[in-house]
């Protein structure tokens, strides 16, 4: 109709649509070089849209069942999708899963309660933090080998403590930078001697695989030389109030808080519960690991090293 002398208003009336539809159709399907409406281009685009519409994601009951199961295991929608790809299991996008979760909430469901709380503001540790003081013979992170930053080898660890309600009780957290593997132990307090002993005991099975440990400047790590000697490793410290230099450990502590929230009385947390949390985190797929679990990544690195050295 554009080839005959008809106005866009007349065309709209002739085919029974609003005039705005005609303008939109012409704008959407004009040839980029000539600037003229191209009916062949319009048809190709329409056919493509029809095919894409047919490809619209289908969220099957089997998928929903899997999502519910993995949400209960504390996986995020993104982790669920990534892990499904690793296992070659069909799954919708994480955006679709989120929409389904919020729809469930509007209908009175509780799936949203399995999501981690998002949007927490980042804050550096400041002078309000107690327990900072002089640590003899500390070696700063600047002297740590550059290979540690590459996160390619197992055995470069970060260590920290989480404090309980009213500063009573503590939890020791150790994690590997390359695999995100974590060791969690309950402490009666933050005295340096028991912290050193528990650290050595927790890592005894991987002693021969450890290269470095990096800590913050808490006085609980004042016996770092004992740890370094007994594990035969090098021990380093972040710059004061530079907790982001232990980014992996800070992230791990956030994951642990999912199970042990701030203000929790640690006397109510059993060693059995601590072990359950450790196992859960070590078997949770991680995005940065290509949705492998820390335990799977650990085995992968160890196997690669075995092949490389012919053992």
Stretches found by the model and what they are:
Residues 139, 143-182:
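An active-site-proximal beta-strand-loop segment
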Residues 262-311:
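C-terminal domain-tail junction helix/linker
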Residues 40-45, 91-149:
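Basic, flexible linker segments flanking DNA-binding modules
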Residues 22, 67, 80, 97, ...:
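Mobile genetic element proteins and their domesticated derivatives, centered on retroelements
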Residues 230-231:
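Short, structured coil segments at secondary-structure junctions
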Residues 3-74, 78, 82-83, 89:
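Short, basic alpha-helical/linker "hinge" immediately adjacent to a nucleic-acid-recognition surface
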Residues 164-167, 184-206:
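Active-site beta-loop-alpha junctions of metal-dependent nucleic acid enzymes
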Residues 215-217, 222-225, 237-260, 267-279:
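RNase H-like two-metal-ion nuclease catalytic core shared by retroviral integrases
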């Amino acid at each position: 109709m554009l080839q005959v002398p008809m106005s866009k208003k007349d065309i709209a009336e002739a085919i029974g649509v609003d005039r705005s539809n005609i303008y939109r159709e012409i704008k959407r399907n004009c040839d980029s070089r000539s600037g003229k409406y191209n009916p062949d281009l319009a048809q190709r685009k329409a056919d493509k849209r029809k095919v894409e519409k047919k490809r619209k994601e289908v969220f099957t009951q089997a998928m929903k069942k899997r999502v519910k199961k993995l949400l209960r295991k504390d996986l995020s929608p993104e982790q669920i999708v990534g892990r499904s790809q690793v296992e070659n299991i069909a799954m919708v996008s994480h955006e679709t899963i989120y929409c389904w979760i919020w729809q469930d909430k509007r209908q009175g469901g509780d799936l949203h309660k399995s999501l981690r709380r998002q949007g927490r503001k980042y804050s550096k540790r400041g002078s309000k933090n107690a327990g900072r003081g002089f640590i003899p013979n500390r070696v700063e992170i600047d002297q740590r080998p550059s290979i540690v930053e590459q996160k390619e080898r197992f055995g470069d660890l970060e260590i920290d403590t989480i404090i309980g309600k009213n500063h009573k009780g503590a939890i020791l957290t150790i994690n590997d930078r390359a695999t995100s593997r974590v060791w969690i132990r309950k402490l009666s307090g933050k005295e340096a001697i028991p912290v050193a002993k528990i650290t050595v005991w927790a890592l005894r099975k991987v002693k021969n695989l450890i290269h470095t440990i990096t800590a913050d400047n808490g006085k609980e790590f004042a016996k770092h030389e004992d740890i370094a000697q007994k594990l035969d490793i090098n021990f380093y410290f972040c710059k004061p109030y530079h907790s982001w230099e232990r980014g992996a450990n800070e992230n791990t502590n956030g994951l642990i808080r999912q199970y042990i929230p701030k203000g929790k009385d640690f006397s109510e947390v059993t060693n059995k519960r601590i072990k359950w949390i450790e196992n859960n985190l070590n078997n949770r797929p991680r995005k940065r690991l290509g949705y492998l679990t820390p335990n799977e990544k650990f085995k992968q690195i160890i196997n690669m090293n075995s092949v490389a050295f012919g053992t």
